[in-house]
Amino acid sequence: MYGMLYESVQHYVQEEYGVDIWRKVCHIIDCKHNSFKTHQIYPDKLMPDIAEALSACTGESFDFCMNFFGRCFVRFFSNFGYDKMIRSTGRYFCDFLQSIDNIHLIMRFTYPKMKSPSMQLTNMDDNGAVILYRSSRTGMSKYLIGQMTEVAREFYGLEIKAYVIESQNDISGGTAGPIKLTDGPLTVIVKYRLDFDNREYMAKRVNTEAHPSQLKMPTVKLDVFLDLFPFTFVLNHDMKITHAGEKIVETWIMHNPGANPKSFIGTHVMDLFQCRRPKDTTIDWDTLIQMRAVLFEFELIRTGHNRAAYDAVLNMDFENYDEMDLNEAQTMALAKAQEFSESHPVDDDESAREDEIDPATGERRSSQGLRSILLKGQMFYIKDVDSLIFLCSPLIENLDELHGIGLYLNDLNPHGLSRELVMAGWQHCSKLEIMFEKEEQRSDELEKSLELADSWKRQGDELLYSMIPRPIAERMRLSEEQVCQSFEEVSVIFLEVMNVYDEGLNSIQGAMQTVNTLNKVFSALDEEIISPFVYKVETVGMVYMAVSGAPDVNPLHAEHACDLALRVMKKFKAHDMGDVAIRVGINSGPVVAGVVGQKVPRYCLFGDTVNTASRMESSSDPWKIQLSKYTGDKVRQVGYKVESRGTVQVKGKGDMETYWLLEGPEG
């Protein structure tokens, strides 16, 4: 949602409940925003969260708070001058209800990412009206009631009572629409009854319908209608086109030269057009009947094009065309188009040139392919034929675009200012919006690419930190040459997994089983590593090596190393591992640590301390933790329970006194 909605909430909560209540609300929901920016997007869920927090602070119900927020918005947008727009929609409240969707269309440039709901006036009587609300958001039904109530009171002097008659997919307290696994998000549909004094509007409506000028109007043939609106088409209950104007059929043939011209009549409208406005609208009879007051924009779908065929159709001489049946004219046009298509095939190079961009203007060259045509108009119900007619005109910016579409000035509606606007180079809002939407789509794609790049960077960092400690990696990023460091004292841990290989299996099966077992054991060990107290150095074969005290200096390195060994022993003893066993050796002393290698850099430890720790592990017994004398004396002083093993013959060291680690100071 845009910040203006939250600005209104913040302003009136502070005004009516006080600044302290607002601060308390922000504290409850952990809102970091001290203020909101009008044109910035904020999370939708923030609105119900504020309502729940305000309800907890004031004792009012959640529905009351959402209703209050809706009233706040109407009172607040007058600061931006939007009250003038509301007052201009009509003399009566019902006029406003019929214009809500068109108001949202007007606002789409100021708030281009606005996900506006759709509202249609479905029924009226002396005592009020019924409106149908569609939205991708849930939990906003009470918010809308607050808006309607305040608009009626503020601009029309009416006191209304609004309540929900029917509701589909609306979830109180949330804003994200419900999900259907097969079709994705579901549309929230709510039907409201608004009770108010509507007698004056209904009387005006009855008087208008009963006026003598209406009763004496002569019958008009549909052919005359189609001549006046050459781009219009008529729809039946199945949304199939039953009649169409001459120019829309010719344009469709030019854009689809390989199609059967007779197939235009009788085809579902959504097979020929894409509905651009209103967005996300289901095109069916009931919906269009309810949305007759809403402006529609349909874009003709193109399936193929051949410029020679187009020009052939454009240059056809339709003699006695008024006396011809429309289908016969279509057949003639198709025959001419197909004749030129066969004799002037489009090669690959020409097809590629259709999407060329003029380097001087940045626009696509209209002479190298037809652009799709955009129709803007309104649906009207014709009672005599029980059909809907889409009265429209094409949106064309200038003469270049006119030719790019494949039309001429005399093809446009004979009435209105269509031709004058094209001659003047009028900038249609809908064309600008299409350009904006394309740029917005590119922006979204760029944003997704950046998010993907960030994700790859995080994965790369995680992989790097698995090979090199984070502090060392950060130093290398800063191009510091010093990647080698000496430590006065650390504790080195070696752990070996024993009896992994099953002699009864063949070599391949045994190797696979060994790898699976080692993977489980080492993965469990990784979970026990608590950085920065202990750092995993490497695994070699069946041996796991870790260190405490490097690369982050830790005066309690011996204690943390022993704690790790005890946790590991306890964890694996609790599981039935069969013949598999582990043994651990720990030694403390000085080491030198650094990054070795360039293509596959590794963080390595060097020194006699490492060798002694390895000997402690290799001379240990299964399910035992062997400590060097120095490490044993060090941890015994702080309460660890150790047992003297005596003297052990250590390769390269001779006789060494060692200890068994039994348990920690807490038992």
From Swiss-Prot:
Residues 347-358 have a biased composition (Acidic residues). Binds 1 or 2 heme groups per heterodimer. Residues 337-364 are annotated as: Disordered. GO terms for cellular component: guanylate cyclase complex, soluble. Heme binds at H104. It catalyses: GTP = 3',5'-cyclic GMP + diphosphate. The keyword GTP-binding applies. Keywords: cGMP biosynthesis, Coiled coil, Cytoplasm, GTP-binding, Heme, Iron, Lyase, Magnesium, Manganese, Metal-binding, Nucleotide-binding. Its main location: cytoplasm. One of its GO terms (biological process) is response to oxygen levels. It is found in: Cytoplasm. The keyword GTP-binding applies. There are two types of guanylate cyclases: soluble forms and membrane-associated receptor forms. This is Soluble guanylate cyclase 89Da. It comes from Drosophila melanogaster (Fruit fly). The gene is Gyc89Da.
